[in-house]
Design a protein with these regions (language model features):
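Intrinsically disordered, low-complexity, mixed-charge
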Residues: 1-91
Length: 91
């Protein structure tokens, strides 16, 4: 299963993508995090189990120290061959 998150708030320019990548890798997840032009961060994660994906969502809602997360949207999606399956990338 692939899970896509859209994170809104003060999440760009505060180390959010690096925070996500570090924790996702630690949870054994693959995928990517990238800034969107509208100020949100998109996080796409695959692999691991439901518990790992749920823990990642908790971490996204908390964010790093200098972030202010206002909203996290979650979408379960079919596996996408464009999503990395062996690493977690910062784009």
């Amino acid at each position: 299963m692939t899970r896509r998150f859209l994170v809104a708030g003060q999440v760009q320019g505060v180390g959010f993508r690096w925070f996500v990548a570090r924790h996702a890798r630690g949870l054994g997840l693959s995928g990517f995090a990238r800034n969107l032009p509208d100020g949100r961060v998109e996080v796409v994660a695959t692999g691991g189990d439901d518990a790992a994906l749920a823990r990642l969502e908790e971490l996204l809602r908390a964010g790093p120290a200098h972030a202010r997360v206002e909203m996290v949207e979650r979408h379960d999606e079919e596996d996408d061959p464009r999503v990395p399956t062996r690493s977690f990338e910062i784009r």
